[in-house]
Amino acid sequence: MNKLVVKCGNFAVLVDLQVLPQGTSKDTSWFSDHEKEEVCTLVRDTLDSRVKEYLDSRRQPGQLKRKEYTQASPLILKGNRLRIAAYFIKRWVKLRCVVKRQYRELHVFPDRFVVCASQLEPASSVWVTEAAATLKESCSSGTSEYFAQPKGIEMTNLLTTPAQAVLKNIVRKTKITKDISDEAERDSRMSPSLGLADTGKADANNIQKALSKAQPEEKRAEEPNDYINTENSLGLPVPEVENDVNHRQPSEASSQQKPQCAELKTQDLSKHLSRLSDSAKQTQSLRASVMQQKRRRHSSEGKERCKKSCLTSDTFIQQGMQRNEAQVKDLEHVPLASQTDPVRHVSADRGDTLPSKPAAIISVASKQQQGALSLFSNIHTEQSVKAVLAPLLNKDLP
């Protein structure tokens, strides 16, 4: 461990320098006086700022907050040849400087500064120098490396990835078609006695599976078509273009099958609409029949009610006529003398006059005559009403 003393104002900061060996061997010969000077220059600014913060904290205690560099979170700095990690350790013992008269005002800083130095790798240093050189060249020329490349190389780099994706999709489609054909041949060989219907069903199922697998791949393949067109415009060789066209045939076949699927969907929709219209017609016919039955029931009930009312009116009229005839007969037997000569009996005790029995009989008879006349008038009115309603009752109600 090496010890250094760095003067910062009136304070002397003690620095404990630890040099890490290079590689697996414990060789520290790489650290020389030149590296020691470089460490002092790297650490100078941090030490000055720390001394200034210490003085400010003594003048105004509890107001300033400084950043603490500890062993867990050290200060890391890089130089041209080395890299250092530094941190402060508080010293609990006060030290004094025993010096000559000219250094009487010099004090020892209360914190100890520990520095660990390690050599940079040569590759990294070379890379840093090369990067700095390239940056200087680019700044001097005013153009970057991206624009310095030729345009043909850029276009090929852009087109390689989508072209590879398209070729992979084409290979997958061809494999799917080959697998379907092989399965169909195997089915035909294994079951020849089943007939053409079973083989047709198997082929249809296989085709549907292939279409369901190929649809997402087609969507992926449709995206980089622009890149393919640009590649063709750049001038690909003729055999590659022919192979690309030959590989695209399954996608064209699938595109021909797409309108057939659309036609089948339209046919299914038309059938469904026709079924709905038929069901609507049936419901309308049922509603009409139900309404007709209700009307017939109401008409029959109305006829029965009219007949009942007519019968009741006839019976009432007959009973009234019989009563009137009986009252008329009773009046015929009453003598005329009793009707013309009323006799009044005066009571001895009271001064009022009371009608005799013949007078009471006459008053009753007159009342009966009035009732008979009212009955005859009612009979005539009921007969006229019956004559008016008879033709209406004979007709059929709608």
Swiss-Prot record:
Coiled-coil blocks: none
Pfam family, one: UPF0492
Region (Disordered): 181-306
Segments of skewed composition (Polar residues): 276-292
Family label: Belongs to the SLX4IP family.
Listed name of the protein: Protein SLX4IP
Organism name: Xenopus tropicalis (Western clawed frog)
